[in-house]
Amino acid sequence: MSHKIMAINAGSSSLKFQLLAMPQGEMICQGLIERIGMANARVTMKTSAQKWQETAPIADHRESVTLLLDKLLSHHIINTLQDIDGVGHRVAHGGEFFKDSARVTDETLAQIERLAELAPLHNPVNALGIHIFRQLLPSTPSVAVFDTAFHQTLDESAYIYPLPWRYYTELGIRRYGFHGTSHKYVSTALAERLGVPLSALRVICCHLGNGSSICAIKGGQSVNTSMGFTPQSGVMMGTRSGDIDPSILPWIAEREGKTPQQLNYLLNNESGLLGISGVSHDYRDVEQAADGGNRRAALALTLFAERIRATIGSYIMQMGGLDALIFTGGIGENSARARAAVCHNLHFLGLSIDEEKNLRNATFIQAENAVVKVAVINTNEELMIAQDVMRIALSDKVTFGVSA
């Protein structure tokens, strides 16, 4: 029996959605509502056969959800609201409380709101989206899918920071990790394509995009990840610095009089590829500038790859070897240059790539004699969310694979 499952990602001024037929994993309709709160909000929806786009005044998130449901009905994508069998919501932060996706109850929702202190920009609007869908679809089960949950298997030695102990016990400061839904999806997809249980593999997943994170997966579980207390830490990103000497911040504050908020903006919005290149946060623009002779752009590309390589090296040490390396995310899936730079001169690890396969974005791009598999796998967080809705909220408990 097929079920229609809605995957929702609510942002501060946007609502991204996908309606999927499950368990097949087929996209029925997907879209985005942008500029919520403005008179010229933009609504984009598409199916495999059609695409619709319009502007309309949308005052708030409730209006955006109401409009979305009305559009699904008016375009005959669904016949009634009861056709939607479940709703899955992406939630930024589950803290230590949520170690898996969870069916939404009043207590679940209250806990998500309490965790807003760890993700003040995201959890409140995620919770708002859940509230609205529960009100408009009161008989439809909903599931919260947490970006942090996959990393709750980290050992204490991997998540504790060397700060005074009370900062962990009293304030919850520790490594949480993010992109968990993506890391879980692509590692599961890799195991299926190899025909090997994920539990038997040592995998490093590189989710590379405007936000980037690396994850070490051993025995099917996350054992380390580069993002930490916030998504700012780890490798260099589009506009985020990643890891730097922390004493740089008070040094800058003293000399330039910057507030904590200004320092946070500097680290999150003015650094990374943009900060070094002076060109753009977009990897493609930086590539183009580097090819045109821009020295800082070329340096930015080198720094980007070297930070990733250093992280991969430390994770190989931790896991005692490597069976497969995965590239995913906007850069990981589309930039042959980035993949080649990360994998350069790693023959001593049994890791090398085939240039032709890499250039055509083949699923497996390792050289013929390479020991380590190197895969390019498009992430699909919406499908992972829909699968969790089926697993947790629907009584028939369908068993899934990941579509190849």
Swiss-Prot record:
Any Pfam family hit: Acetate_kinase
Domain of life, source organism: Bacteria
SUPFAM superfamilies tied to this protein: Actin-like ATPase domain
Metabolic or biological pathway, per its Swiss-Prot or TrEMBL entry: Polyol metabolism; 1,2-propanediol degradation
InterPro entries per record: Ac/propionate_kinase, Aliphatic_acid_kin_short-chain, Aliphatic_acid_kinase_CS, ATPase_NBD, Propionate_kinase_PduW
GO CC term (a single one): cytoplasm
Entry's localization field: Cytoplasm
Predominant localisation class: cytoplasm
Keyword Nucleus found: no
HAMAP family (UniProt xref): Acetate_kinase, Propion_kin_subfam2
Family as reported in the entry's similarity comment: Belongs to the acetokinase family. PduW subfamily.
Name by which UniProt lists this protein: Propionate kinase
Species annotation: Citrobacter koseri (strain ATCC BAA-895 / CDC 4225-83 / SGSC4696)
